[in-house]
């Protein structure tokens, strides 16, 4: 049975690691201290934390294990689960403490917890087995299993699984986490290894530790990049330990049978958890995979912290515990608040640079102490049943005993009750105890009186002697002693008489019951072992008989003396005899008790069959003793004494007779034994005589043989030889027989044991067979039950999902109806209000009062739909806001007409209640607002303090490095020139000043830490404000009021933050431009000075000295400069490291020319005639970096996307944007005139202009697309800035300071309302290095005013759809736009063209427009997502953008045509609708997805059968086979497993291969024939994969991402072929025709590419692709 749940708190130990050498060198101070002898740690000056264990810097591994873990291992043998997990920041010593980082050269004293626990475990197992064998018990059986899990990037990996691919760590694992019926957590799909010895376990630990993911960061050389959980399962089968009471009960039950051992099975699991450390990316310097791992680690630790907070915070214990937020907390569920003894080891760093991490760790650890676990013993069901039956047996035995003793009775009606005798016995026992106390008190009184009598009698005798003149002190003492002895003897005599009287009565009763004890059976000859024992027993019995006879004589003599002394004492003593007789009786009673005890012992030795009767006699004797005492107190007559002595004599006489009989029996037995002995001896003598006669006969025969002389000597020798041979053979036979006899005797002796063992084993086998049959039957039943349960649950889940879908559909319908009703109701209310004003007009004054009152009290907000609509109206038409406020206020103030006649009364009540509620709500809102403001200010203060502390730490680190450099320089100078050098003194003085600065900074750090601690304490105290009470006390109306204000405050705060951010970005852009300009001017100045310095040595020396002084100073903002790797430096480094720029310019430091750089360098600006050489040199250097150059680094050059709009190609063609416009124009003109570079496109020049004009563009950032546009468009991309393309070429000539009026107009209104201009396809300028490019951009199509979302093409035509609500048709032969297909309700998200029918299909919101472009752009039909068909245009072309989707419709994300053009498939919602284009009818739907279908592609399997592949936001890809004429709902034929980690964005089919791109940045390759995954690239791009396409004429896959990068992949090997920057904004679509590739992007252009240098999917030229990346 499971033991009662025992609440055990999570125990917390804090371990402070020693300081690292690096921290000591950098001057880090220790900010922790430990109270000696107390588990208390101080952080900073006075912030104390108390834990269960605290281990200081000098603590050893053995100490930690002994104090914390040893008890948990012992508890595992009793069936208790245990967990040890190390928690703390990275580099705090968790892996070292746990011992999961296996090191071969580790010393024994440095071994971690796991190694010591394993040794302790197996040592205890051996000890328990040895102890059981010594005690004669069956040894316990142990089964030890081990598991080693790793939680990497929220995926559970099995470190014991040797078959898994170590490189595929990001692949989804098949391990599942489940919870059993008792709340325990177990895993499915994990490798479990059975181990029997310590070396095996250590080998398993070693293998798992070597497979664990580790990497190097700036804070830790070998940092754990995953959470590790090493689990040991111990299963123990042992003999059930029994208590003394159970032993006694069992002995009574099985006293006649052999004892049977009962076994119990205990299980326990021990988790050793090594958590990865919490990280700050700034400090670890993690990028790429390391950064993702750090984010995943922090997410898991955040979930763990939330669980600890929910369990440890007393106010949150009733709330939900978020175990399922992370797999880490799910695995540790039973360790935190479950069935486990848990110890948390918080590892912290003592250095002050880790102050905040240490503080947070200690806070979480302190909170974890409040977690209560419910610990219980883990037993199997059989052991639980045995324990339950034992307790039941014990209870029933107690109940049976109570029935036997009469405590419980059952009356006539069957009702159980307590017997009155029990209560009476309890009362009598109480009374008996009281009487015993009284007797004891009376005994003390008697002793005192006896002493007093003795004293008085002795004094009286002394007086008599004194009168006679014979008084002497010795005589008086002698008299006193005699009198005392007489008194004692008299008391003993009285006691003996009373005892004898009782014994006489008992004997009389016993004789009447059984006159003979039949004791002869006890002394029967069968029991007596030998004659000696029998003789001894007889002698003892005779001695006892003699003693009894002597005692009888003494009793007779004493009786006579008593009679004589009685006569004398009656005449002398008088009244005092009563007390004396009492004392004498008591003394005699004591003597008689001793004698009686001796007699009892003798009788017990002789008569063993009557022990029970003697116990009853003793009880009666005790009762009679009390009666005897009472009688001795009452009667003192001599007749009673005589009667007692006579009874005693009779008793002794009876005993003598009995013992005489016993002696006679013993003597008879002895005589019989002697007779048997004599007969045995006679028979023995007879056998000996017979043996002697046989020997004599043998000798006589031999003598006769020797006396025969007739035989010859030869014959005698022959006979003798034969006889000797026979004799020798017989001797051998005799020896053999003797050996066989011994063996036979031994076998006979062992046969019984073997038979017993055989029977026992046969019984065990039969029991095991029965058990096996029973278990198999039970397993089958359980499996059948589980199967039925699973099927029932699946049906229930399916039904619930179906019901949920129905409810959701009904809910959407109801919401739409509600919105319509609200609109109608609002209009009706306004009409009613207007009619009332006409009937009963109100004065302006009164109306103004009402308006002001309602506006000041902030009338409750309307419904969400109306508020959203009013929000739109307010933002788009701010001028009408004040006009609309008064009518709306009146509508809200006046209630709707009611059917009864009490409208005015109802109105007054509602109005007064609303004012009162508003006032109360306003007070509550002010309280909450103040609290929110306080929290914000506290967090800002703490954040500022942390920033100050980090700044101080950086300063201290910088000063420490400078001091180290000076120290090394001093040592060098001392070695070279001795200590007498003056420079040594200067260096020492400078070092002293640096030390003083470091000390000052340390004091500042300490003050900052103290302030942070005070703020933390204030925050903790402030959190106790009962804000929840205020919220709980709110009514529904007040809650709406508060929610409205919270929403308004959130919007205002967000607006303020956005404005501040925009201002910051503008200022950053200006600052960066200023810095670049300043740097360029400084470089020009230095260049001029350097030319002069060649002629002036003093100036040269001065410049060199300045360079040396500036060389030693590192950049102030080292982190920022390290993160921004590009040609432009960060603001912090630009101003402070002028020397590096100057040295680069002078050639003293060679710049690291990176392969991707295509910007004009400063050397090229200064030496215009050498630019070609520089570019060639850079190209040559770039060619060494390999075929694949990374593109992402081009985005990390320190500029934001909004502040640096110039692409890499523009930077090559134009001057740096930081230079003034004149310089840029001069350089551009010179380059055009001298080198004849082709003129860049208008967009290119416009970008260069717009960068300078950025502040003005910031003000017009708002567009009418809004948030709803981005939510409706398939892939959410960064918002693009709407610009007007009215006069692209003239805009370049506008002066820099004058804003564009047309642009302002474009931003104020929708772009579709402006004049539609024809687009044009321009040739794209060729650049250097394009020969190594796999794709070459040959043309660019410009004409859309907003982002291009979709594209389709043939060999002659190009179709593009955009956010500007138009679809343009382009002629690829002439390069002109030939038509624009109308204005759509919203964004055109998909476009398809049918070659067979010349129809164009465009998609916008829930509509599909069908265009016939053979004669003119004419919409012939409109299809809807619900399956409706309308001739012509169903949605009229409105001037405003339509965001709302009609009720019953859903957003259409993409459409696709089958190869024959007969069927159209439209992805709307989570289904795909099929359209028969011959009849323009909807024939059915493809269902099965749980999320919206984002993309689809169609292929033809055979004639009349289409293959449709769909990708959804639910991460899954499904395949449908649709035959011609299929109707209704079609289910998927296959689901591709495993799914992506995020929604699917693009699909492409090539033969039997399917390619899928997802928002998880990965691309997967599937086999359509085998329906399985072939290959995958988890991080193919650094952002969403938005589009896929196949390069025409080559087995190459092209992928485009949201970052604007294009990558090429070999279709067969799935190896990357190349990458390039396709656009400066997200790529939305890719399509191909027979010769070209088309890419559409958010930059409002479509680029046309041609395959170049591709042969069979490989690059023909091994040159670097970086040139093309930069050029594009």
From Swiss-Prot:
<feature type="repeat" description="WD 7">
    <location>
        <begin position="1622"/>
        <end position="1659"/>
    </location>
</feature>
<dbReference type="InterPro" id="IPR019775">
    <property type="entry name" value="WD40_repeat_CS"/>
</dbReference>
<dbReference type="GO" id="GO:0031114">
    <property type="term" value="P:regulation of microtubule depolymerization"/>
</dbReference>
<feature type="compositionally biased region" description="Acidic residues">
    <location>
        <begin position="598"/>
        <end position="639"/>
    </location>
</feature>
<dbReference type="InterPro" id="IPR001752">
    <property type="entry name" value="Kinesin_motor_dom"/>
</dbReference>
<dbReference type="GO" id="GO:0031113">
    <property type="term" value="P:regulation of microtubule polymerization"/>
</dbReference>
<feature type="repeat" description="WD 2">
    <location>
        <begin position="1383"/>
        <end position="1421"/>
    </location>
</feature>
<feature type="coiled-coil region">
    <location>
        <begin position="1055"/>
        <end position="1085"/>
    </location>
</feature>
<feature type="compositionally biased region" description="Basic and acidic residues">
    <location>
        <begin position="560"/>
        <end position="597"/>
    </location>
</feature>
<keyword id="KW-0677">Repeat</keyword>
<feature type="repeat" description="WD 3">
    <location>
        <begin position="1447"/>
        <end position="1485"/>
    </location>
</feature>
<feature type="modified residue" description="Phosphoserine">
    <location>
        <position position="1231"/>
    </location>
</feature>
<feature type="region of interest" description="Interaction with KANK1 and KANK2">
    <location>
        <begin position="1142"/>
        <end position="1169"/>
    </location>
</feature>
<feature type="region of interest" description="Disordered">
    <location>
        <begin position="1109"/>
        <end position="1139"/>
    </location>
</feature>
<feature type="repeat" description="WD 1">
    <location>
        <begin position="1343"/>
        <end position="1380"/>
    </location>
</feature>
<dbReference type="InterPro" id="IPR027417">
    <property type="entry name" value="P-loop_NTPase"/>
</dbReference>
<dbReference type="GO" id="GO:0043622">
    <property type="term" value="P:cortical microtubule organization"/>
</dbReference>
<dbReference type="Pfam" id="PF00400">
    <property type="entry name" value="WD40"/>
</dbReference>
<keyword id="KW-0206">Cytoskeleton</keyword>
<feature type="repeat" description="WD 6">
    <location>
        <begin position="1580"/>
        <end position="1619"/>
    </location>
</feature>
<dbReference type="GO" id="GO:0008017">
    <property type="term" value="F:microtubule binding"/>
</dbReference>
<dbReference type="InterPro" id="IPR036961">
    <property type="entry name" value="Kinesin_motor_dom_sf"/>
</dbReference>
<keyword id="KW-0505">Motor protein</keyword>
<feature type="region of interest" description="Disordered">
    <location>
        <begin position="780"/>
        <end position="808"/>
    </location>
</feature>
<feature type="modified residue" description="Phosphoserine">
    <location>
        <position position="1671"/>
    </location>
</feature>
<dbReference type="GO" id="GO:0005829">
    <property type="term" value="C:cytosol"/>
</dbReference>
<feature type="modified residue" description="Phosphoserine">
    <location>
        <position position="1660"/>
    </location>
</feature>
<feature type="domain" description="Kinesin motor">
    <location>
        <begin position="9"/>
        <end position="371"/>
    </location>
</feature>
<dbReference type="InterPro" id="IPR056532">
    <property type="entry name" value="KIF21A/B_hel_2"/>
</dbReference>
<feature type="modified residue" description="N-acetylmethionine">
    <location>
        <position position="1"/>
    </location>
</feature>
<feature type="compositionally biased region" description="Polar residues">
    <location>
        <begin position="1198"/>
        <end position="1207"/>
    </location>
</feature>
<dbReference type="Pfam" id="PF23203">
    <property type="entry name" value="KIF21A"/>
</dbReference>
<feature type="modified residue" description="Phosphoserine">
    <location>
        <position position="1227"/>
    </location>
</feature>
<feature type="region of interest" description="Interaction with KANK1 and KANK2">
    <location>
        <begin position="1148"/>
        <end position="1169"/>
    </location>
</feature>
<feature type="modified residue" description="Phosphoserine">
    <location>
        <position position="258"/>
    </location>
</feature>
<dbReference type="InterPro" id="IPR036322">
    <property type="entry name" value="WD40_repeat_dom_sf"/>
</dbReference>
<keyword id="KW-0597">Phosphoprotein</keyword>
<comment type="subunit">
    <text>Part of a cortical microtubule stabilization complex (CMSC) composed of KANK1, PPFIA1, PPFIBP1, ERC1/ELKS, PHLDB2/LL5beta, CLASPs, KIF21A and possibly additional interactors; within CMSCs KANK1 and PHLDB2/LL5beta seem to be the core components for recruiting microtubule-binding proteins KIF21A and CLASPs, whereas PPFIA1, PPFIBP1 and ERC1/ELKS serve as scaffolds for protein clustering. Interacts (via residues 1142-1169) with KANK1 (via ankyrin repeats 1-5) and KANK2 (via ankyrin repeats 1-5).</text>
</comment>
<feature type="modified residue" description="Phosphoserine">
    <location>
        <position position="1241"/>
    </location>
</feature>
<feature type="compositionally biased region" description="Basic and acidic residues">
    <location>
        <begin position="1247"/>
        <end position="1264"/>
    </location>
</feature>
<dbReference type="GO" id="GO:0005938">
    <property type="term" value="C:cell cortex"/>
</dbReference>
<feature type="repeat" description="WD 5">
    <location>
        <begin position="1539"/>
        <end position="1576"/>
    </location>
</feature>
């Amino acid at each position: 049975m499971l033991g009662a749940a025992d609440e055990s708190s999570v125990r917390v130990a804090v371990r402070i690691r020693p300081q690292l050498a690096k921290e000591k060198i950098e001057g880090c101070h220790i900010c922790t201290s430990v109270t000696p002898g107390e588990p208390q740690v101080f952080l900073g000056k006075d912030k104390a934390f108390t834990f269960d264990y605290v281990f200081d810097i000098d603590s050893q591994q053995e100490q930690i294990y002994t104090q914390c873990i040893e008890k948990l291992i012992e508890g595992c043998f009793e069936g208790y689960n245990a967990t040890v997990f190390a928690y703390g920041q990275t580099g705090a010593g968790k892996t070292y403490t746990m011992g999961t980082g296996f090191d071969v050269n580790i010393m024994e004293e440095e071994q971690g917890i796991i190694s010591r626990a394993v040794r302790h475990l197996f040592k205890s197992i051996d000890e328990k087995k040895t102890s059981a064998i010594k005690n004669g018990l069956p040894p316990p059986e142990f089964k030890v299993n081990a598991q080693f899990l790793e939680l990497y990037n929220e995926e559970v990996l099995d470190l014991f699984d040797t078959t898994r691919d170590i490189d595929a760590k990001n692949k989804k694992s098949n391990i599942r986490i489940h919870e059993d019926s008792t709340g325990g957590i177990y895993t499915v799909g994990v490798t479990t290894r059975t181990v029997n010895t310590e070396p095996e376990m250590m080998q398993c630990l070693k293998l798992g530790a070597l497979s664990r993911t580790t990497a190097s960061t700036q804070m830790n050389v070998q940092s754990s990049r995953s959470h590790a959980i090493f689990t040991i399962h111990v299963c123990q089968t042992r003999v059930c330990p029994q208590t003394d009471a159970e032993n006694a009960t069992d002995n009574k039950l099985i006293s006649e049978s052999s004892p049977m051992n009962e076994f119990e099975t205990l299980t326990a699991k021990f988790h050793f958890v090594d958590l990865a450390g919490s990280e700050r990316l700034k400090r670890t310097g993690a990028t790429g995979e390391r950064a993702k791992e750090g984010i995943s680690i922090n997410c898991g630790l955040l979930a763990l912290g939330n669980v600890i907070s929910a369990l440890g915070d007393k106010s949150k214990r009733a709330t939900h515990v978020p175990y399922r937020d992370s797999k880490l907390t799910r695995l540790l569920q039973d360790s935190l608040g479950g069935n486990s003894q848990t110890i948390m080891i918080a590892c912290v760093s003592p250095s002050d640079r880790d102050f905040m991490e240490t503080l947070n760790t200690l806070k979480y650890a302190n909170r974890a102490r409040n977690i209560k676990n419910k610990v219980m013993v883990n037993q199997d069901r059989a052991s639980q049943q045995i324990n339950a039956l034992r307790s039941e047996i014990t209870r029933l035995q107690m109940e049976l005993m109570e029935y036997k003793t009469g405590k419980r009775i059952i009356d006539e009606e069957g009702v159980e009750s307590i017997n009155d005798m029990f209560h009476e016995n309890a009362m009598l026992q109480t009374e008996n105890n009281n009487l015993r106390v009284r007797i004891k008190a009376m005994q003390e009184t008697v002793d005192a009186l006896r002493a007093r009598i003795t004293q008085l009698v002795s004094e009286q005798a002394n007086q008599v002697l004194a009168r006679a003149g014979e008084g002497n002190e010795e005589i008086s003492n002698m008299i006193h002693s005699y009198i005392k002895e007489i008194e004692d003897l008299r008391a003993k005599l009285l006691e003996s008489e009373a005892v004898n009287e009782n014994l006489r009565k008992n004997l009389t009763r016993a004789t009447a019951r059984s006159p003979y004890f039949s004791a002869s059976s006890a002394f029967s000859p069968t029991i007596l072992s030998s004659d000696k024992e029998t003789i001894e027993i007889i002698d003892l019995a005779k001695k006892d008989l003699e003693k009894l006879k002597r005692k009888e004589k003494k009793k007779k003599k004493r009786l006579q003396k008593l009679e004589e002394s009685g006569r004398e004492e009656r005449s002398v003593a008088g009244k005092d005899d009563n007390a004396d007789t009492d004392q004498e009786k008591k003394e005699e009673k004591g003597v008689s008790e001793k004698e009686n005890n001796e007699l009892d012992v003798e009788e017990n030795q002789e008569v063993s069959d009557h022990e029970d009767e003697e116990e009853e006699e003793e009880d009666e004797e005790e009762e009679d003793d009390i009666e005897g005492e009472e009688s001795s107190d009452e009667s003192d007559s001599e007749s009673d004494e005589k009667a007692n002595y006579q009874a005693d004599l009779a008793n002794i006489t009876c005993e003598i007779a009995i013992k005489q009989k016993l002696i006679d029996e013993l003597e008879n037995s002895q005589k019989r034994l002697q007779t048997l002995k004599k007969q045995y001896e006679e028979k023995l003598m007879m056998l000996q005589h017979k043996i002697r006669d046989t020997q004599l006969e043998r000798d006589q025969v031999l003598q006769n043989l020797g006396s025969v002389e007739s035989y010859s000597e030869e014959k005698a020798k022959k006979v003798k030889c034969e006889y000797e041979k026979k004799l020798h053979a017989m001797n051998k036979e005799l020896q053999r027989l003797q050996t066989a006899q011994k063996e036979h005797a031994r076998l006979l002796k062992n046969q019984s044991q073997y038979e017993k063992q055989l029977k026992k084993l046969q019984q065990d086998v039969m029991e095991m067979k029965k058990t096996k049959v029973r278990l198999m039957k039970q397993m089958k039943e359980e499996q059948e039950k589980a199967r039925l349960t699973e099927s029932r649950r699946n049906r229930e889940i399916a039904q619930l999902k179906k019901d949920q879908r129905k409810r959701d559909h009904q809910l959407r319908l109801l919401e739409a109806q509600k919105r319509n009703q609200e609109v109608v109701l609002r209009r009706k209310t306004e009409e009613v209000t207007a009619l009332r004003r006409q009937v009963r007009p109100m004065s302006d004054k009164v109306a103004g009062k009402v308006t002001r009152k309602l506006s000041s009290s902030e009338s409750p907000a309307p419904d969400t739909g109306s508020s959203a609509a009013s929000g739109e109206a307010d933002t788009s038409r701010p001028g009408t806001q004040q006009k609309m406020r008064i009518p709306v206020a009146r509508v809200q103030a006046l209630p709707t007409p009611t059917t009864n006649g009490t409208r005015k009364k109802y109105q007054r009540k509602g109005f007064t209640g609303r004012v009162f509620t508003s006032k109360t709500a306003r007070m509550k809102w002010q309280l909450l607002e103040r609290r929110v403001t306080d929290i914000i200010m506290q967090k800002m203060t703490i954040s500022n303090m942390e920033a100050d502390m980090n700044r101080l730490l950086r300063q201290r680190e910088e000063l420490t490095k400078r001091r180290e450099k000076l120290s090394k320089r001093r040592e060098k100078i001392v070695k070279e020139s001795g200590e007498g050098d003056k420079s040594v003194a200067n260096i020492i003085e400078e070092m002293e000043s640096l030390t003083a600065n470091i000390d000052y900074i340390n004091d500042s750090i300490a003050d900052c830490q103290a302030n942070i601690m005070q703020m933390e304490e204030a925050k903790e105290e402030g959190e106790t404000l009962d804000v929840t009470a205020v919220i709980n006390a709110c009514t529904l109306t007040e809650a709406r009021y508060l929610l409205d204000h919270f929403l308004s405050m959130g919007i205002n705060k967000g607006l303020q933050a956005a404005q501040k951010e925009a201002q910051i970005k503008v200022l950053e852009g200006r600052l960066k431009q200023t810095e670049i300009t300043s740097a360029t001017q400084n470089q020009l100045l230095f260049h001029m000075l350097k030319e002069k310095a060649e002629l002036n040595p003093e100036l040269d020396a001065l410049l060199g000295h300045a360079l040396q002084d500036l060389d030693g100073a590192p950049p102030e903002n080292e982190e920022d400069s390290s993160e921004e790797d590009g040609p432009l430096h960060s603001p912090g480094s630009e101003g402070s490291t002028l020397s590096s720029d100057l040295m680069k310019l002078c050639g003293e430091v060679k710049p690291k020319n990176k392969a991707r750089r295509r910007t004009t360098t400063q050397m090229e600006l200064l030496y215009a005639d050498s630019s070609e050489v520089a570019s060639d040199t850079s190209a040559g250097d770039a060619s060494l970096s390999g075929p694949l150059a990374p593109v992402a680094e081009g985005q990390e050059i320190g500029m934001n996307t909004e502040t640096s709009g110039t692409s890499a190609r523009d930077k090559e063609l134009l001057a740096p944007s930081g230079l003034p416009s004149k310089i840029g124009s001069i350089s551009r003109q010179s380059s055009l005139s001298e080198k004849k570079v082709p003129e860049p496109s208008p967009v290119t020049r416009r970008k260069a202009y717009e960068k300078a004009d950025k502040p003005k563009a910031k003000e017009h950032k708002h567009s009418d697309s809004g948030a709803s546009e981005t939510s409706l468009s398939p892939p959410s991309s960064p918002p693009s800035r709407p610009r007007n393309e009215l006069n692209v070429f003239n805009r370049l000539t506008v002066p820099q300071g004058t804003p564009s009026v047309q642009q302002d107009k474009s931003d104020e209104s929708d772009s579709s309302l402006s004049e539609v201009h024809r687009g044009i396809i321009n040739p794209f300028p060729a650049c250097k290095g394009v020969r190594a490019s796999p794709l070459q951009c040959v043309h660019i199509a410009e004409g859309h005013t907003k982002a291009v979302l979709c594209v389709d093409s043939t060999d002659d035509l190009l179709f593009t759809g955009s956010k500007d609500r138009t679809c343009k048709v382009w002629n690829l032969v002439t390069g002109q736009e030939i038509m624009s297909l109308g204005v759509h309700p919203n964004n055109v998200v998909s476009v398809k063209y049918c070659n067979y029918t010349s129809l164009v299909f465009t998609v916008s919101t829930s509509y599909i427009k069908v265009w016939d472009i053979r004669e003119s752009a004419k919409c012939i039909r409109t299809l809807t997502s619900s399956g409706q068909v309308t001739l012509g245009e169903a949605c009229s072309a409105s001037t405003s953008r339509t965001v709302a989707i009609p009720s019953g419709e859903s957003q259409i994300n993409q459409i696709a045509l089958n190869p024959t053009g007969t069927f159209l498939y439209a992805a709307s919602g989570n289904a795909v609708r099929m359209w028969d284009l011959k009849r323009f009818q909807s024939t059915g739907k493809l269902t099965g997805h749980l999320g919206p279908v984002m993309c689809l592609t169609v292929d033809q399997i055979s004639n009349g059968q289409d293959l449709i592949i769909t990708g959804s936001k639910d991460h899954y890809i499904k395949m449908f086979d649709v035959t011609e004429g299929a109707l209704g709902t079609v289910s998927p034929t296959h689901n591709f497993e495993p799914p992506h980690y995020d929604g699917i964005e693009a699909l492409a089919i090539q033969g039997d291969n399917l390619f899928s791109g997802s928002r998880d940045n990965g691309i997967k390759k599937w086999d359509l024939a085998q329906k399985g995954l072939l290959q995958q690239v988890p991080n193919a791009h650094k952002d969403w994969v938005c589009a896929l396409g196949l390069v025409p004429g080559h087995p190459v896959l092209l992928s485009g991402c949201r970052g604007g990068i294009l990558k090429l992949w070999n279709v067969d090997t799935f190896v990357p072929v190349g990458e390039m920057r396709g656009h400066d904004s997200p790529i939305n679509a890719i399509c191909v025709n027979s010769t070209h590739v088309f890419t559409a992007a958010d930059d409002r252009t479509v680029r046309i590419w041609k395959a170049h240098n591709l042969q069979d999917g490989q690059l023909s030229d091994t040159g670097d692709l970086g040139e093309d990346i930069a050029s594009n």
